[in-house]
């Protein structure tokens, strides 16, 4: 008589049979490792990404995304017609950076600190000093960061935006992340 035990589920279902979101698990693991750096328990929703993308300036082509995470905004940008070679994603977390590179091989994904945005954009050859980028889309948890970090990031953002470019940021909190 065989005593086969059921195998542990490591795929797409939990013990209760509900779907497991691999991106949500990856994101949550990173949050457990460094909650202050992640600033959120789970990735942004597709609905939020859609609302953010609707704020892009008309005809936007060169886009920088800060805090690419699991790629929710990245996918929305690509779905909205942004060419992969016109998208630069900056992600500080090494594991999420690797995930983004695998998921979006045609997109320029950089493992770097948003505080160094100007150097990242210039160093990557993504745009030149005169033209700037059309928009910066950010999912960073700005309100969980020290003021000096916020200032450094915002300085970099406004240094790389073209005249008339747009900074698109969301936050969960009682105050604007940009003041």
Role assignments for model-derived ranges:
Residues 22-58:
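Class I SAM-dependent methyltransferase Rossmann-like catalytic core
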Residues 60-69:
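Conserved class I S-adenosyl-L-methionine
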Residues 70-82:
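Conserved SAM-binding loop of SAM-dependent methyltransferases across substrates and taxa
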Residues 93, 113:
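Conserved SAM/SAH-binding beta-strand->alpha-helix loop
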Residues 100-101:
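Conserved SAM-binding loop
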Residues 133-148:
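A short SAM/SAH-binding and catalytic strip from SAM-dependent methyltransferases
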Residues 151-163:
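A short glycine-rich, Lys/Arg-flanked "PGG" loop and its adjoining helix->strand segment in the class I
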Residues 164-172:
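Conserved beta-strand signature within the Rossmann-like core of class I S-adenosyl-L-methionine
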């Amino acid at each position: 008589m065989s005593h086969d035990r059921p195998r542990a589920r490591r795929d797409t279902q939990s013990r209760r049979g509900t779907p497991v979101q691999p991106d949500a698990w990856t994101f949550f693991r990173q949050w457990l490792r460094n909650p202050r750096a992640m600033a959120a328990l789970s990735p942004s929703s597709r609905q939020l990404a859609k609302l953010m993308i609707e704020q892009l300036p008309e005809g936007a082509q060169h886009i920088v995304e800060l805090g690419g995470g699991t790629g929710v905004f990245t996918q929305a940008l690509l779905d909205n017609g942004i060419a992969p070679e016109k998208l630069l994603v900056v992600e500080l977390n090494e594991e999420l950076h690797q995930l983004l590179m695998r998921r979006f091989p045609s997109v320029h994904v950089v493992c770097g600190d948003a505080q160094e945005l100007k150097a990242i954009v210039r160093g990557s050859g993504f745009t030149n000093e005169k033209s700037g980028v059309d928009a910066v889309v950010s999912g960073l948890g700005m309100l969980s960061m020290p003021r000096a970090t916020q200032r450094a990031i915002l300085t970099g953002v406004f240094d790389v935006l073209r005249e008339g470019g747009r900074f698109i940021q969301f936050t969960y909190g009682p105050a604007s992340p940009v003041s």
